[in-house]
């Protein structure tokens, strides 16, 4: 008997490659519609004449055991004769990665064979199908349940006949749809965007008595390792096997050498149990708690207290860290964002290594989880390789500061007597664990307040006394004051939580800041990033100021990558100023799992006493803990770096070769053999300066917040070229203010009411417009244009424009936008004179032309003002003839009186 099977292609979105197994990409196939008894002979061929496909067409003879199945590759349109010794159900795989093709496959079957009962969801009554299957001599049947296709084996026939197929359909489709949503996948029939899902996808489920373990997710199907489907027909929120194996379809690259194999997919499983279960069931039935939450929390507490390396934690201990990571309001957006980032990366350049997983999660979150990660013993790497294959700085803490991220931390470490059952402070939001992560805003309802003293330890109190400080929860300022005359900060009426402290950093001296609880009460997670933990009961804090003289940007470093996928392993800092070498270890696996072969070794030798220090990284390092390893050195110490492979240790801009490279610590730099101190260190410092300046340009909010990077830029610029003003705009306020001009144009109307303020700060590339509320308009006596503000870019395009007739109502508005050198400002005022004022650094400029039209051009640091249009070649002139009949002069408005902007 003849059969013809036509199968479409599986179209891949741009982020998915042929041969990858994610989201069931190779699971689609079409049944021939028969069951072949053992030893059945048949012929098969594919029609290549019209299809246009470039890969073999695959026919599979499936049953319930991989050891008795067969795969047939059709490479041309010639007939192939086949005889198979085992009962089987023939299928044709959908060609993967092709577009706009249909594969046609022809079968000629000799001898008897059995029709395969097939059910397509919602196309006929279920009972009609079950009746057909019940009466059929076939032990097999095939189900199309939208997002899952299921080959039911003979051993599961009775179980399938007893199953509610509508509920089975709902069970599988809800799981896959939810996992798609968690990953941010969007249905798209054209599959041509970075977030496109796989069109017409479906998981393929079968039995496999020869399969590994209890069940598995494979490239071509998911199956229990049994001759029957077992739990794959059990509809229950506790069916961990099914939700676990389906979750593997979404592992992507997140489990590659991250110690998260069987963790990442289970974090999705936990989320769907979270969705399905009510509060009581969540505690009793969820796999992460199993009615033993207090005991599991105690285990986590012991691991933290003992500083156990996170990579050595147990399976479910690591999993529950993700439970608490994803529980907060926007926690799941972290998961969606990191998946989107992966797809962008895969679409753009799959050869570039992915970021270290903890850095990746940190930069994908809407809240700041860095302190939480440190608590459990993982350290996000602060470097990554960008799309141009260049190692760049994440600046994780500054990025969080610029984005106004709130810091989440376990509630039990904030309200130290909190207990979910016995003392929960009647908190109204849903919490399921004493380790749930909260922010200060969520704890206001407790009405717990503290007066906290921050003791400042500094060599020169005059650098900070009387200076303002503030405390922030994300973007919200919750407290502000000034440093008291005794050199301390006093916080009054502050609720519990982790805040960001914006502390003064000195005036003409710069400092590094370190924040911690009092030494006798080491509760606070000490840090250099101004994360201020206010506990209940509260403790006082200690803020230690250490003079900052030599910029960190002048410190050379090396970047260590993994052997196979170039994953980020460690940063090595060679600090000649502090005479230290510091290793920041971010990944304990540099190569193959469980392999103890030497991967990297550093030996530091003291030339004066012959002593040496050694730091070793094997391919796998289960006993190492992520974090910092610091070694003291002396001038002329030799630092021997031994690499087992080439091209995985980047020093400066050069990948070091396999074998040994010896560096020497000089007073101001580290050099390779046969080299002598030269200007190369300054060149590398200048390159880092420009890179970090670009970072501040990208996160311009940091230009208005005192921070260590601005200190570092100032100190490094003084080292590279003290006379240069290239980096002035990035300096700390104390050093930047003398170069900062703030121009305020103020428009007034009838009764001298303020209509509009236009403020321009050229050095910071910032313009701000504040428009007042005036229902009657600027001046009700005029029905014509009364005033106008317009800014244009260097191409003449309008950046901002606002105008009103005299009797045209005004409503309040506030605009903030960037302006650059060469931008022009055009102002019109119907009644010039006192109705249009220019205030420079809080001083009224009395020489503003008293004309209706005022023109100005922005330069790098100042504003050129006149009453006629300013040509490009006049931009830098201080006194220039405009060429008009009145010989009007254009001046640079300047003053010696500065303000802290």
Swiss-Prot record:
Alphabetized UniProt keyword annotations: Glycoprotein, Late protein
Glycosylation sites: 265, 278, 339, 349, 540, 594-595, 642, 683, 698
Alphabetized Pfam families for the sequence: Mucin_bdg (PF03272), Peptidase_M60 (PF13402)
Gene3D superfamilies: Peptidase M60, enhancin-like domain 2
Functional summary from the UniProt entry: Involved in disruption of the peritrophic membrane and fusion of nucleocapsids with midgut cells.
Protein name (database record): Viral-enhancing factor
Domain of life: Viruses
Span of domain Peptidase M60: 27-330
Signal peptide: none
Alphabetized InterPro entries for the sequence: Mucin-bd, Peptidase_M60_dom
Gene: VEF
């Amino acid at each position: 008997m003849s059969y013809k099977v036509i199968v479409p292609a599986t179209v891949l979105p741009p982020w998915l490659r042929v041969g990858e197994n994610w989201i069931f990409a190779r699971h689609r196939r079409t049944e021939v519609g028969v069951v072949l008894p053992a030893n059945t002979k048949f012929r098969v061929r594919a029609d290549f004449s019209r299809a246009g496909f470039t890969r073999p067409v695959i026919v599979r003879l499936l049953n319930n055991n991989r050891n008795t199945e067969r795969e047939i590759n059709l490479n041309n349109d010639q007939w192939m004769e086949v005889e198979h010794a085992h009962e089987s159900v023939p299928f044709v795989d959908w060609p993967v990665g092709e577009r706009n093709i249909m594969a046609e496959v022809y079968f000629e079957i000799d001898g008897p064979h059995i029709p395969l009962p097939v059910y397509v969801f919602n196309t006929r009554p279920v009972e009609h199908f079950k009746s057909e299957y019940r009466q059929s001599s076939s032990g097999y049947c095939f189900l199309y349940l939208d997002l899952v296709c299921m080959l039911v084996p003979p051993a599961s026939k009775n179980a399938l006949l007893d199953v509610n197929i509508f509920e089975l359909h709902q069970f599988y489709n809800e799981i896959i749809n939810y996992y798609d949503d968690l990953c941010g996948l969007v249905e798209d029939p054209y599959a041509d965007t970075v977030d496109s899902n796989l069109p017409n996808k479906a998981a393929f489920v079968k039995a496999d008595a020869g399969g590994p373990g209890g069940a598995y997710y494979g490239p071509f199907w998911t199956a229990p390792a049994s001759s029957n489907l077992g739990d794959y027909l059990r509809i229950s929120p506790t069916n961990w096997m099914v939700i676990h194996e389906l979750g593997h379809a979404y592992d992507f690259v997140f489990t590659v050498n991250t110690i998260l194999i069987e963790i990442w997919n289970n974090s999705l499983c936990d989320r769907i149990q979270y969705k399905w279960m009510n509060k009581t069931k969540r505690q009793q039935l969820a796999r992460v708690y199993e009615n033993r939450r207090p005991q599991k929390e105690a285990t986590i507490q012991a691991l933290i207290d003992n500083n156990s390396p996170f990579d050595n934690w147990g399976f479910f201990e690591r999993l529950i860290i993700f439970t608490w990571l994803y529980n907060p309001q926007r926690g799941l957006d972290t998961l969606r964002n990191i998946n989107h980032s992966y797809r962008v990366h895969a679409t753009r350049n799959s050869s570039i290594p992915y970021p270290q997983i903890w850095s990746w999660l940190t930069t994908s979150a809407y809240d700041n989880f860095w302190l939480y990660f440190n608590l459990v013993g993982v350290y996000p790497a602060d470097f990554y390789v960008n799309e141009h294959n260049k190692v760049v700085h994440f600046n994780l803490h500054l990025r969080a500061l610029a984005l106004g991220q709130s810091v989440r931390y376990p509630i039990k470490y904030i309200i130290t007597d909190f207990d979910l059952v016995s003392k929960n402070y009647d908190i109204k939001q849903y919490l399921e664990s004493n380790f749930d992560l909260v922010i200060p805003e969520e704890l206001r309802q407790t009405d717990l307040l503290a007066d906290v003293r921050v003791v400042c330890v500094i060599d020169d109190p005059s650098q900070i006394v009387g200076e303002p400080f503030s405390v922030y929860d994300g973007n919200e300022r919750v407290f502000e004051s000034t440093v008291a005359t005794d050199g301390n900060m006093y916080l009054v009426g502050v609720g519990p939580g982790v805040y960001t402290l914006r502390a003064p950093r000195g005036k003409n001296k710069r400092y590094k800041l370190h924040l911690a609880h009092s030494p006798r009460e080491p509760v606070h997670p000490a840090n250099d990033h101004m994360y201020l933990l206010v506990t209940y009961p509260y403790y006082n804090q200690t803020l230690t100021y250490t003079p900052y003289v030599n910029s960190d940007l002048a410190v050379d470093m090396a970047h260590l990558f993994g052997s196979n996928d170039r994953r980020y392993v460690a940063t090595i800092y060679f600090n000649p100023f502090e005479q230290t070498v510091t290793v920041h270890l971010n990944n304990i696996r540099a190569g193959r799992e469980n392999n103890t072969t030497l991967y990297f070794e550093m030996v530091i030798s003291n030339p004066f006493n012959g002593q040496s220090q050694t730091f070793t990284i094997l391919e796998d390092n289960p006993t190492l803990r992520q974090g910092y390893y610091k070694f003291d050195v002396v001038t002329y110490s030799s630092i021997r770096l031994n690499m087992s492979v080439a091209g995985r240790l980047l020093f400066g801009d050069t990948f070091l070769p396999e074998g040994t490279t010896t560096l020497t610590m000089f007073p101001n730099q580290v050099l390779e053999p046969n080299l002598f101190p030269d200007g190369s260190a300054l060149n590398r410092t200048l390159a880092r300066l420009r890179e970090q300046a670009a970072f501040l340009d990208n996160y311009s909010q940091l230009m208005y917040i005192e921070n260590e990077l601005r200190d570092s830029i100032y100190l490094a610029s003084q080292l590279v070229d003290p006379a240069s003003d290239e980096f002035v705009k990035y300096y700390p306020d104390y050093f930047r203010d003398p170069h900062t001009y703030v121009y305020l144009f103020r428009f007034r109307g009838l009764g001298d009411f303020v209509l509009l303020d236009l403020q321009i700060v050229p050095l910071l590339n910032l313009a701000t417009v504040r428009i007042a509320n005036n229902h009657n308009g600027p001046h009700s006596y005029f029905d014509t244009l009364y005033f106008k503000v317009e800014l244009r870019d260097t191409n003449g395009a309008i950046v901002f424009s606002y105008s009103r007739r005299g009797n045209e109502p005004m409503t309040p508005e506030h605009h903030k936008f960037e302006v650059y050198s060469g931008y022009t400002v055009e102002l019109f005022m119907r009644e010039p004179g006192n109705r249009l004022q220019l205030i420079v650094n809080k001083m009224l400029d009395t020489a503003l032309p008293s004309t209706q039209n005022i023109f100005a051009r922005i330069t790098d640091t100042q504003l050129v003002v006149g009453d006629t249009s300013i040509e490009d070649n006049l931009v830098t002139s201080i006194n220039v003839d405009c060429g008009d009949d009145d010989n009007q002069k254009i001046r640079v408005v300047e003053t010696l009186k500065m303000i802290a902007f």
